[in-house]
């Protein structure tokens, strides 16, 4: 920060303190405050959307990676028994394809049509925030100069040129502030209104990507069903699968090895 900038920062800090103590009257612009609140709400929502969009892509990768680990474990658990009908090996192959093909094929389109546009939208916020900060600084300058003019009016200086000179500086400060303020009051609503048409294509792309992932996942998993006995699907549909599982558990409990610990 330059020396000139440092002095301005100190003067503005002093003006803020004097406003709090009632020595300098603060300009209140309800219209700007309303538009700034609306902008802050949109900024917060957009940043959250950016975070969640990235999280969605990470979650897809994590889910398919977890499926792959489960499939490998199931295949190892089945061992030779699974090789008889091939169900565990086929299931492993299906989830590996889902991870290797479907998710990786969706990665590029998701970034191009969803994540990158949202990130570009959010990239404008630092410039807008800088403009708002500059406007607030110019408002402090305007209020400070107005207070100086009023002080000279209430208590005239021996230097007769001081009041006209200060009034000129105050008019310039007011013009700079009002130019920035009017620009923000005019353009912030336009930015907020543009958010929907800008993000609509990304929203549509997100739905299509989700649809493709779910459809291809369903189609691949549905193929695994052909390896299961028809009676298993019928028992599941008729609510009889729990009984069948209980029968298997009872058979396990009936094994002599299961009762060795109780016999000691």
UniProtKB/Swiss-Prot annotation:
SMART domains named among the record's database cross-references: BAR
Subcellular location: Cytoplasm, Cytoskeleton
A GO biological process held by the record: actin cortical patch localization
Keyword DNA repair: no
Domain BAR: 17-237
Stated name of the protein: Protein hob3
Main location: cytoplasm
Record key words, sorted: Cell cycle, Cell division, Coiled coil, Cytoplasm, Cytoskeleton, Septation
Single Gene Ontology MF annotation: cytoskeletal protein-membrane anchor activity
A GO-annotated cellular component: mating projection tip
Coiled coil: 25-65, 165-187
Function, as annotated: Involved in cytokinesis and septation where it has a role in the localization of F-actin.
